[in-house]
C-alpha cells in the first residue's frame, strides 16, 4: 500500500484517524495526539488490516511498542472493563462513613457495628468478618452522613456454606423523588446499574432479614457507579493482542467483585468483555498490578 494509517480503539473496532505516505519503507506522521495508543493499519480488499505492533506515544513524545511476551507469564487481577471518569468518582465518595451493622431486634436497637467504610472507591470490595461469637438475624448498611445511602449491590456470604445468603430485603420504604427504580430492592437485584437512593439524605439504610440468626463470614458490596466493575454472576472473557488479532485467554463467571487470571502473556495489550450485558469496553495494559486503560 502507498499509505499507512494509525488507528485508535473505539469499542470494539480499530478506527483510522491519521495517514501518511510510505517512502522508502518509512511513513512519517505529524501532529499526533500524545499519551495515546495507536495501531498501524492499511486498507486492503478485506478491510482494515494491521501492519505493525500497537504502540504508545507518551506525553514526552517517546514511542513505546507493545508486544506480548508468551515466554514470561503473569497473574492478573481485574476489577473493571472500562476506564473510570470523574462523574463516577463524584458519586462514589458517598459510600464513605457507611457502617455495616447486625442485631437480633428489628429496630436495630443495641446493634453491633461490623465494619465502617473509611475509604472510598469505585470498585467492589470484600469485607472478611472474623467469627463474632454470636449470630444475628438482621444485617444492614447504615449511612449516617449526607449520601442517600447510595449502594449498587450488597451480598452476604454465610460462613458454613460459603454461599450467598438471601433473606427478605428491609430498609427505608421510599427512595429519592419516590423513584421505583431506586427502591431498597435495587441493592440486591444483581444489577450494577441500579442502586438504592434513600429518600433521606442522612440516616438511610438497607439490609436483610434472614428470618433467623445467621453467621456471615463475608460482605461484598459495590458503591453506586457506572456498571463497569465486575458483576457477580456475569460471564467475562479476557483477550490479548497477538499476531495482529485478539486471542482469548478464557471465559469466567464472576463469583466476586474481581477476576483472577493466571498464565497471561506479560507486557501486552488486553481487552475484557462482559458476555452477559453492557457495551462499554476498553483496551488496557497491565502495569505494576494495575489496569491502565487506553
Predicted regions and their residues:
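Beta-strand-rich interaction surfaces with strong enrichment in secreted/lumenal proteins
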Residues: 16-17, 53-55, 115-118, 128-129, ...
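Short, ordered, surface-exposed loop/turn motifs in non-cytosolic proteins
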Residues: 2-13, 93-98, 151
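Glycine-centered loop/turn motifs
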Residues: 2-3, 35-36, 41, 60-62, ...
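Aromatic, loop-rich ligand-recognition surfaces of beta-strand-rich domains
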Residues: 70-110, 121-251, 255-294
Amino acid at each position: 500500500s502507498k499509505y499507512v494509517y494509525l488507528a485508535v480503539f473505539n469499542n470494539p473496532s480499530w478506527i483510522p484517524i491519521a495517514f501518511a505516505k510510505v517512502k522508502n519503507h518509512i511513513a512519517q506522521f505529524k501532529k499526533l495526539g500524545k499519551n495515546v495508543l495507536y495501531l498501524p493499519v492499511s486498507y486492503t480488499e478485506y478491510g482494515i488490516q494491521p501492519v505493525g505492533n500497537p504502540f504508545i506515544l507518551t506525553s514526552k513524545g517517546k514511542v513505546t511498542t507493545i508486544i506480548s511476551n508468551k515466554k514470561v507469564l503473569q497473574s492478573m487481577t481485574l476489577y473493571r472493563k472500562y476506564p473510570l471518569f470523574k462523574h463516577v468518582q463524584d458519586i462514589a465518595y458517598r459510600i464513605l462513613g457507611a457502617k455495616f451493622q447486625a442485631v437480633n431486634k428489628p429496630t436495630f436497637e443495641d446493634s453491633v457495628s461490623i465494619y465502617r467504610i473509611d475509604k472510598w472507591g469505585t470498585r467492589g470490595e470484600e469485607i472478611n468478618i472474623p467469627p463474632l461469637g454470636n449470630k444475628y438475624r438482621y444485617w444492614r448498611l447504615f449511612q449516617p452522613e449526607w449520601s442517600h445511602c447510595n449502594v449498587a449491590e450488597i451480598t452476604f456470604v454465610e460462613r458454613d456454606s460459603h454461599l450467598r445468603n438471601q433473606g427478605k430485603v428491609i430498609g427505608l420504604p421510599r427512595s429519592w423523588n419516590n423513584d421505583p427504580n431506586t427502591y431498597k430492592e435495587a441493592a440486591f437485584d444483581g444489577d450494577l446499574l441500579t442502586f438504592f437512593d434513600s429518600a433521606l439524605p442522612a440516616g438511610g439504610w438497607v439490609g436483610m432479614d434472614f428470618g433467623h440468626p445467621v453467621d456471615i463470614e463475608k460482605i461484598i458490596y459495590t458503591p453506586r457507579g457506572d456498571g463497569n466493575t465486575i458483576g457477580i454472576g456475569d460471564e467475562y472473557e479476557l483477550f490479548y493482542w497477538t499476531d495482529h488479532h485478539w486471542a482469548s485467554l478464557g471465559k469466567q463467571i464472576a463469583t466476586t467483585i474481581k477476576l483472577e487470571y493466571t498464565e497471561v502473556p506479560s507486557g501486552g495489550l488486553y481487552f475484557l468483555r462482559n458476555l452477559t450485558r453492557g457495551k462499554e469496553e476498553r483496551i488496557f495494559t497491565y502495569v505494576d498490578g494495575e489496569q491502565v486503560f487506553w
